[in-house]
């Protein structure tokens, strides 16, 4: 299967972010926050944003110039 270069290079970033989404949704559920109506979409959007932001902070991508030099 031919995946795009970006996905082959950054698969661990996406996997980590999706794992964080599940964890944050579990934390929100354990805290007892009960969302109704449009709030469910807002909570989902916020968990996605926070998860990808944290994944970007934790996982740093190497510079492409460094990769090409090796």
UniProtKB/Swiss-Prot annotation:
Top-rank taxon, per record: Bacteria
Disulfide bonds: none
UniProt-listed Pfam families: DUF2754 (PF10953)
Subcellular location, record wording: Cell membrane
GO-annotated cellular components: plasma membrane
Transmembrane found in the keyword field: yes
Residues spanning the membrane: 13-33, 39-59
Keywords: Cell membrane, Membrane, Transmembrane, Transmembrane helix
Main location: membrane
Database matches in InterPro entries: Uncharacterised_YaiZ (IPR020490)
Membrane topology: Multi-pass membrane protein
Name listed for the protein in its UniProt record: Uncharacterized protein YaiZ
